[in-house]
Amino acid sequence: MRSFIFALLTLCSLMAVADEQWKPFPYDQSGFDYSGDKLRQAWPQLTRGFGDNYPFPDAQWVMKMATTHPKALEMTVAGNTGFTGKPEDAEAYAQKLQNVWRLVFKGDFAQAKKEGLALGVGGQVPAMFAQVVYAMFLVPNQEEKHRLLEEVIDYTDKAGELVQADTVAQFGRVYAKARLGEELSVPVVLKRGYTSQIPNELDALLAKQPGQPFALALYGGYEAGVIRKVGKMVGKMTYGVSADKMETYFAQSFKQADNLPIGHYEYANALTYVYGDDEEAKAVQHLKQAVALKPINAMEALEVAHAKALLKEHEQKVAQN
């Protein structure tokens, strides 16, 4: 019975993907070719935001995950993914999984989601990561953006404890909540429990991986976002956030990796949320740092483009004052 349910869930997921029409990546993709061995060679740099030693999804990793997480294996087999748990199937499955990551890094987000979900639990991580990136940068309206982010959270809810097996899955889940928390009203955020879930999930992730740059920057952005909504005093007394903690999280993130565009523009936003115009020069400095970085994948190209737009807004603001 459980196998039937798992297979049904997988089928429903694939049907949902088929109905979606996502916008294509708007920039040149020629610099994001990670075919063949290029993916493994570039993997440490491509995944530096996830922290040190995020595992490359080769056949050895596939078998390790299958052995360590029997429920994931059961779901994968039930989903008719072509992987039966036998070592002789692992290489073919790993190649398919690697290709999903290639699609993510190249900016073929819709195809990455489709092919990722077709691989079952193992492919959900890059599939949902592709969806988060697409939702944040390419969705034309806020309602659709929120729907896609909520779907990411729903996928991780269905995965249950399996989310704990992958730090990117954990990050994607809390990132989606944090982005929704920024844009939804305070009553809605409170009703959904995001004000406690976001810091709790970030604490759990950082306890497991203290040096993850993305998670550290997200925590800093969360602190700033709460201050922006409720003010410094209420933020500190009610939610335990502060400008000092915001600064500490970003400093730790930059110490781990200072060449991530998103880190610099998120810090620029945080400075504005917390200090207003008082740290305008510093915000502009970090936006310029983001813009100066050469993107090595599609997500970073979107981040640099976003930083350019923010920088233009700040420069126009300065010119008017």
Feature map (PLM): residue ranges:
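Positively charged n-region of N-terminal signal peptides that target proteins for export
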Residues: 1-4
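Short coil/turn connectors between adjacent alpha-helices in alpha-solenoid helical repeat scaffolds
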Residues: 135-148, 181-194, 227-241, 274-282, ...
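Hydrophobic helical h-region of N-terminal Sec-dependent signal peptides
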Residues: 6-11
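N-terminal alpha-helical interaction modules that lie
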Residues: 18-163, 168-170, 176-182, 195-203, ...
